[in-house]
């Protein structure tokens, strides 16, 4: 039986696109820091990383799609923070950004990672941006490396 498993060490360079939402930038900058830390620790060079900032989480899927279609990247990491407020806006944004990123992932030949926090309050977002619940930007970048290597292994 043949088993495929992604690795965190790559024989070939990996080019990563990162899409960051500027809304809740205080949180998103921590997610980006985590993602860049993960990539650096796994020998991804700065020249192989491109970061694009969009106004908010709702705009992430469009730019993720443009990056994926450009064929310049092996993976795209999407980072944002949607925090519940007192209106239903949160529900709509969460649903659409989730669907949008999933659609980009399914309709492109590269991994598109979901690193968008969807939290009830600012405390939960802070916890997931580098404190007691880890850093979801770091986790998303690690998953991107693993998925790129898994795809390369399957396509050998």
UniProtKB/Swiss-Prot annotation:
Keyword annotations of the record: Riboflavin biosynthesis, Transferase
EC class, as a word, reads transferase
EC number assigned by the record: 2.5.1.78
Which reactions are catalysed by this chain? (2S)-2-hydroxy-3-oxobutyl phosphate + 5-amino-6-(D-ribitylamino)uracil = 6,7-dimethyl-8-(1-D-ribityl)lumazine + phosphate + 2 H2O + H(+)
Gene3D superfamilies xref list: Lumazine/riboflavin synthase (3.40.50.960)
Domain of life, source organism: Bacteria
What family, per the record? Belongs to the DMRL synthase family.
What name is this protein filed under?
A: 6,7-dimethyl-8-ribityllumazine synthase
Q: Which organism is it from?
A: Brachyspira hyodysenteriae (strain ATCC 49526 / WA1)
Q: What is the lineage of its organism?
A: Bacteria, Pseudomonadati, Spirochaetota, Spirochaetia, Brachyspirales
User: Which gene produces this protein?
Assistant: ribH
